[in-house]
């Protein structure tokens, strides 16, 4: 069958109202259910991917390819995105759109991505854990070769001093491919975007380092194609990434002599043979979900948690540094209100969290206020405040969704702390008929009740003491909630059995069509420091956390009877907020 296809040209609107251009090549066979989404290299656009559709020769498959924001025919300043995290969210929204447009589930989607596009996709898989069938990554740009010494720190310093600016790429087509026609077309294509915003280039490095270090969180079937003679990106980071992947189905292929444009090389038939074989294997079998059943005992995060619980080597440089930090906190912490509160109630307590939400540096003197400001501006607490913003956005979205379905909106938060984020989100929501806040701490309940009274919300908000891990208590909640919120709770407990009990109770309480909003912590850059220096609410013991990958957290929610439908994550990749709908069993 002739496979040459002319694409339809359309625009897709993102959640921040940016119009992204995309091409769609419908399947040539009626009733086809396979979908492949293509992501182009940096600087390029979807018009340069026509040969992939033609040469893969899959007439039973629909293809989609976008022009990334700021590229090709898409809107936005050339080469710019507000952040790499925003571009990763674009990936999530576009793939979900492609699946919906083709009327298939995500499990029927395979993604093929090159270079910078491959980094976006790898980050999306890590941060969002989408249930697609698999992915092919070609020469991901985890570490771009900057030939000027100290270019990266110089760019970071200049960005800090000057703000946003753009760097032009002077890479010529002859360094990208041996295919003279493709090289010439790259040099002369008016839609090629030579500029890249400095924030995106710096984000690309930082995010790539995070994804490589934590690649064990990626469990989807993955094929990695590495160009053997790449002038643009380093090889070793790609290998490090691949070796840490935990998918039971993964392949690495090194293509000798290939330049950076792996899928546009002169001898690209070699790469296409590898892709065709891998994709055929993916579609030949039913989509398989990774087994997270024993993740809290045998997974990499469990091993890391046990190592952190044991502490650093005595008198090692790390141990001495942590001892110094603990001494300094005891000596100076009394002057900082935030540090003093954390040392008194636990840095993971509801009281500490509420203080972080308020974000008002306080202390007994100017020095104490300065220390407090530094404390509140740590990346972890900035992530917590962004999590609060994401919670409020999804709570409002959930209320609107329930109201649109004709369901009464009855809210419960099973571990509300002081309840500030819930009260802020629901203060002006007339559709909400009942709000129940619960917490295990008597102090949190008392302070939460005081906050409710101060806001004049006592008529429709109740705050009671309760155990968020007691399935019988949760199953018996009255009236039955249609919106349940669990924020910042499961992250504090390494064992999954407690989480399963809590989710089982909520699944019994929430009627089909109801909504669960839950948070996650798939990664944290300060995990070791927190374990070595800060104390928890658990009798002053060290605050040692086990991070759960987004895939693990989503699997617990799915097994309890909920289907995840949307997610938010901060720009540092630390905290996620997800929304799931109760299935009708």
Swiss-Prot record:
<dbReference type="InterPro" id="IPR022742">
    <property type="entry name" value="Hydrolase_4"/>
</dbReference>
<dbReference type="GO" id="GO:0016020">
    <property type="term" value="C:membrane"/>
</dbReference>
<dbReference type="Pfam" id="PF12146">
    <property type="entry name" value="Hydrolase_4"/>
</dbReference>
<dbReference type="InterPro" id="IPR029063">
    <property type="entry name" value="SAM-dependent_MTases_sf"/>
</dbReference>
<dbReference type="InterPro" id="IPR022744">
    <property type="entry name" value="MeTrfase_dom_put"/>
</dbReference>
<dbReference type="GO" id="GO:0016298">
    <property type="term" value="F:lipase activity"/>
</dbReference>
<dbReference type="Pfam" id="PF12147">
    <property type="entry name" value="Methyltransf_20"/>
</dbReference>
<dbReference type="InterPro" id="IPR029058">
    <property type="entry name" value="AB_hydrolase_fold"/>
</dbReference>
<protein>
    <recommendedName>
        <fullName>Uncharacterized protein YnbC</fullName>
    </recommendedName>
</protein>
<dbReference type="InterPro" id="IPR051044">
    <property type="entry name" value="MAG_DAG_Lipase"/>
</dbReference>
